[in-house]
Design a protein with these regions (language model features):
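Extracellular/lumenal glycan-associated surfaces
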Residues: 41-56, 104-121, 169-186, 235-252
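Bacterial N-terminal signal peptides that target proteins for export
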Residues: 2-14
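Bacterial N-terminal signal peptides
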Residues: 11-23
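Small disulfide-bonded, cysteine-rich extracellular recognition modules and tandem repeats
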Residues: 4, 21, 49-50, 88, ...
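Short, flexible domain-boundary/linker segments around small modular repeats
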Residues: 60-103, 124-168, 193-234, 258-294
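C-terminal region of N-terminal signal peptides and the immediate post-cleavage residues
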Residues: 20-35
């Protein structure tokens, strides 16, 4: 091969690698983690980040989970950013290899939305092994109106590896207010440690999780072409958000730069967010006994 041909090959390879990591470009998913091992290990610590409103964006959402498949499509307007949710481990239990490689890159920025009440009755069962060991009972709830749309972002320009990016960039969760039926839950203690590299130096936090306030369910935005192997896992991603309380903090706030990863929102500018202490904790659940496969 001539020197000129070799140079052209290297240039083409470099171009392909660049396309693979750019948030606004399409890329084929080489694979995805199996549904139950991934979903059951995804815990998100959610921080308040009020004060920023993105440029106007109107989105049409379609439900992905089989239990909610009959709910109609809806169009929402992206409002003020309210939370940033980042991946954590509970009580020192790190997700297993091959799963943690995906979990640690799930950062979701949550924006206010509005919509009509669906009044959908559900029974929620915990999936995470740490919570199941605590003996937390199933919760009987009614899913009310949508309150937030949580979409994937990167922090401080640190992108997931290409094979992970092609999966996490499609995670969109629509969060509905809940009416919890029966006796309020007894708060349960947990110790949270950060999994994402950007926040790895943050100390662990002791929290008490109280009542479930929201149920976040998987949706797809019109214009987002989700690969079949990615959809097979994401359709099972349901998180119940619980209010948490913490002790007095000795750690100062952290300022982060957020960049959108989903192709539909790639045109939106980067955002600044300041986080301090967690306000809620998203825990994986199954709806009406429908356990994710795998």
């Amino acid at each position: 091969m001539s020197r000129r041909s070799t140079s052209r090959c290297f240039a083409a390879l470099a171009s392909l690698m660049l396309v693979a990591v750019l948030p606004g470009t399409a890329t084929a998913a080489p694979g995805a983690p199996p549904p139950l091992p991934f979903v059951s290990q995804l815990d998100l610590s959610c921080y308040r980040t009020e004060g920023y409103k993105p440029p106007p964006a109107e989105l049409t959402l379609k439900h992905l989970n089989p239990v909610l498949a009959k709910l109609p499509m809806e169009t929402v307007k992206l409002g003020e950013r309210q939370q940033l949710c980042v991946p954590v481990a509970k009580n020192g239990e790190i997700p297993p290899p091959g799963i943690v490689d995906f979990v640690r890159w799930v950062d979701l920025s949550c924006y206010r939305i509005e919509g009509g009440a669906v009044n959908f009755p559900l029974t929620l069962s915990h999936l995470n092994p740490v919570v199941r060991k605590l003996g937390i009972q199933d919760a009987h709830v009614t899913m009310l109106s949508p309150e937030q749309l949580c979409v994937p972002v990167a922090k401080n320009g640190v992108l997931p590896p290409p094979e992970v990016l092609s999966f996490v960039r499609h995670i969109d969760l629509e969060c509905y207010a809940l009416r919890v039926l029966g006796i309020p839950a007894v708060p349960f203690p947990l110790t949270l440690g950060h999994l994402n590299p950007v926040l790895a130096d943050r100390p662990k936090v002791d929290v008490k999780a109280g009542n479930a306030r929201q149920l976040c369910v998987p949706v797809a935005k019109r214009g987002d072409e989700i690969p079949p192997e990615v959809l097979d896992t994401l359709q099972w991603l349901d998180l119940a958000k619980y209010d948490v309380t913490t002790g007095p903090s000795v750690v100062g706030p952290v300022t982060l730069k957020l960049t959108h990863l989903n192709p539909v929102l790639a045109r939106l500018p980067s955002e600044e967010a300041v986080i301090t202490e967690p306000a809620q904790l998203g825990l994986p659940v199954a709806k009406n006994g429908k356990i994710p496969p795998g």
